[in-house]
């Protein structure tokens, strides 16, 4: 059973996780087998070296908490998983960049193409996206929207997945 630490959960930033019987939620990052960074508000543009955009709505307190959790997990060698905002956060903190605003994308259902040729139907509930051409060497692009925009990335090693 995996011990999962949900970053920023203790201050109310994440929704309850579905219990599958394969993981246990822990509240001490030092006890975690994996750190989860979930969806939510926009990433502060200063984290990926851009000015604040017109449509950007951030949670500076959450960013502060999650950057500290990222730094701890990286130092301790704890694998990290990023979903939606979490993937964007890991990309920014690993030196990549984001498209700060993509018009007509929030609330949009679209296909995602995968590196093995599969096609998935996904919902996009955000307007920020990872820039797949501003490569983070530790990440491999696994899936992208038809535009193409990054949808799924994985760490090349065993310590970071988004």
Q: Where do the language-model regions lie?
A:
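N-terminal beta1-alpha1 cap of cysteine-dependent amidohydrolase-like domains
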Residues: 1-85, 92-99, 103-160
């Amino acid at each position: 059973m995996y011990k999962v630490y949900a970053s920023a959960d203790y201050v109310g930033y994440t929704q309850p996780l579905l219990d599958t019987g394969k993981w246990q939620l822990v509240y001490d990052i030092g006890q975690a087998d994996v750190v989860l960074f979930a969806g939510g508000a926009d990433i502060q543009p200063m984290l990926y070296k851009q000015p604040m955009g017109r449509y950007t709505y951030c949670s500076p307190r959450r960013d502060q908490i999650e950057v500290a959790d990222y730094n701890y997990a990286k130092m301790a060698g704890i694998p990290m998983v990023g979903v939606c905002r979490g993937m964007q956060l890991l990309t920014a903190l690993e030196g990549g960049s984001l498209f700060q605003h993509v018009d007509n994308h929030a609330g949009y259902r679209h296909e995602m193409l995968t590196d093995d040729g599969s096609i998935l139907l996904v919902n996009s509930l955000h307007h920020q996206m990872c820039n797949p051409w501003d490569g983070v060497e530790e990440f491999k692009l696994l899936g992208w929207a038809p535009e193409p925009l990054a949808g799924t990335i994985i760490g090349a090693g065993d310590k970071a997945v988004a």
